[in-house]
């Protein structure tokens, strides 16, 4: 039950219902949500089901190129021979990205979709909208995948040091950022435009560690992470 002014349009009401439902159901013990806004019940039945995210797809790189690894072998998606640290989209197994000698490359079904000049030593990240996140500085990360080529997305907390890697959560709402001399891990919110185009990473919070530094990190769910 919420006490606030109800949205005036059906689109705004649907967006509010979606935002509240998706936020609350991220808690493991919440399976269903009913929303009442100043006595007016919002429809939550028509909220679209989120896509199924594949987080266990194995992607490899070798002398024959980049491909998806399965029990039956390797399905090659690219013939790049200098690839390292490959990754794959959480919703599209035909979209792969990797670090090359002169930058980050991405292909979908064998067709090039992005090139990001610079170095991404821990490899790129591909989000659910098809954007490829690659080389970074202390204050921004290079992103590509659209018709306008690579562009920079600002990242807060520049004083925390150079960014080593950016990992986007499967649902595309959060960024896991590895940065600094001692390689600390931070989690922030991905701000996007209406089409899903990334605009900034904000509200970064450092993940506390008892000791040591972070070598690499990954998302295990849209809200769970693993640090190495």
Task: Pin down the residues of each PLM region.
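Bimodal "functional hotspot" detector
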Residues: 1-228
